[in-house]
Regions:
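Short Pro/Gly-enriched beta-strand edge/turn motifs at strand-loop
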Residues: 54-66, 136-140, 281-286
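Glycine-rich, flexible loop/turn motifs
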Residues: 23, 29, 101, 127, ...
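Rieske [2Fe-2S] iron-sulfur-binding domain
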Residues: 64-170, 176-184
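N-terminal short leaders/motifs
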Residues: 12-41, 107-120, 151-159, 229-266
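N-terminal pre-ligand scaffold of iron-sulfur
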Residues: 1-109, 155-158
Length: 418
């Protein structure tokens, strides 16, 4: 059966290069991932440790911490962590485990005062993680006990734009290094000032990678999203990638003449001509899908729950100056994305059913439409095999083939020429 030799067996050691032969080939020869990558409990467990336990994982939007004393409870590579700010407003992150006997401190987001209390024996910690209260503990006559030795175990937390990221790997590069040149590419949007306008979460019966891959490729656009294709035409899609842990595409120009959903809201101030006329669609590895338009953004944060279950946290962002947007104006944009997302959810859930069926061997990828998937798969392979590598940008010789660059070859012209 074509491609079957490239499908890793259920007993494959995913920490070795032998399991990734089809992925490591050039895009013109590469295969998609085998079904085990989406359906195997063993793969999922390894992935949580090697991908989500070592990467800069998005854990929310910065303004989720706006209330003083707000604490976010998040899963990071299967480990529960707490995210907050100290009294100076600086980001802090900790393991969600009391240093006394390991009790979980919080089970849901909440707002605390100056002290975070363990529900078991009331040990208390300030928002820097320092142990500040041990009721009746020292009075019991314990020897050589120094509270400064028993603060909460810290984790790294950084802000990128208006997004919050956490990392369990204390040796990982900074989040700015992780995303490479993407910060400069998006600098004109001034994302650090954008704010949440609406959020909701939904469970999707599909592997998190299926959700991400569906976002990254536009091969399906005409058939799954006929309405989206009116404002984001297939022939106007081009690669939007460089040095950094991200995969992306851009729609240039946006075609608002057929459907005006994206024209209702005011655009951000200070955008250059290219950003004003374009949509940027970027998958930030591993778990953020960012649709960035001149006047709003739709962000999907993926939380893997199991091999075939993903919790998708959706947030609509607006730029500074949009605080007074009318509900009826925003509703048009909201409903547009709900429609698109519903179409995507339906097809990725169908994809999961097919992968679970046991009848799939890896297919080939389209260089023009699916190269971001090849890049994504290789990022995944790097993390799974223990390679700490940040990918480079596109090679100059690849630009026409992959539909990228400042002045990409017209889509139809390229296909007709070959």
């Amino acid at each position: 059966m074509p491609g079957s030799s490239l499908s890793a067996s259920p007993a494959a050691d995913w920490t070795t290069e032998d399991a990734w032969i089809g992925t490591r080939r050039p895009i013109l020869e590469a295969h998609a991932l085998p079904a085990d990558a989406y359906a195997s409990e063993a793969f999922f467990a390894l992935e949580r440790d090697r991908v989500f336990g070592t990467s800069w994982v998005c854990i929310g939007i910065a303004d989720e911490l706006d209330p003083v004393g707000q604490v976010l409870v998040r899963d990071l590579g299967g480990r529960s962590v707490l995210i907050t700010t100290n009294t100076s407003g600086e980001l802090r992150g900790f393991a969600n485990s009391c240093r006394h006997r390991g009790t979980q401190l919080l089970d849901a987001d909440c707002t605390i005062g100056r002290t975070l209390r363990c529900p078991y024996h009331r040990w208390g910690y300030d928002r820097d993680g320092t142990l500040v209260a041990t009721p009746q503990f020292i009075d019991a006559g314990i020897d050589r006990f120094d509270p400064t030795d028993y603060g909460l175990h810290p984790i790294r937390v950084e802000q990128w734009g208006c997004l919050l990221f956490a990392n369990l790997d204390h040796d990982a590069p900074s989040v700015d290094e992780w995303f490479g040149d993407l910060g400069n590419r998006l600098a004109g949007y001034r994302l650090e000032g954008w704010h949440s306008h609406l959020s909701h979460s939904i469970d999707i019966r599909a592997n998190w990678k299926l959700v991400s891959e569906n976002f990254q490729e536009y091969y399906h656009l005409r058939w799954i999203h006929p309405e989206l294709a009116k404002v984001s035409r297939v022939e106007d899609h081009f690669r939007y990638q460089g040095n950094g842990m991200y995969c992306g595409q851009t729609t240039t120009p946006l075609s608002g003449d057929e459907r005006g959903d994206w024209d209702v809201l005011r655009p951000a101030e200070g955008l250059d001509a290219a950003d004003t006329a374009s949509g940027r669609f970027v998958a930030l590895f591993p778990n953020v899908l960012l649709s960035l338009l001149p006047n709003h953004a739709f962000v999907m944060r993926l939380e893997p729950i199991g091999p075939g279950l993903t919790r998708e946290h959706c947030t609509w962002l607006l730029p500074p100056g949009s605080e007074d947007v009318l509900d009826e104006d925003f509703a048009v944009t909201r409903d547009f994305w709900l429609e698109i997302n519903s179409e995507d959810i339906g097809i990725v859930q169908r994809g999961q059913v097919g992968l679970d069926s046991g009848g799939y061997t890896p297919g080939r990828l389209s260089p023009r439409f699916e190269e971001p998937l090849h890049r994504f798969h290789n990022m995944l392979a790097d993390r799974m095999t223990g390679i700490a590598r940040i990918p480079d940008g596109d090679l100059a010789d690849d630009l026409p083939l992959l539909g990228t660059g400042i002045n990409p070859l017209p889509w139809r012209s390229h296909l007709s020429a070959h």
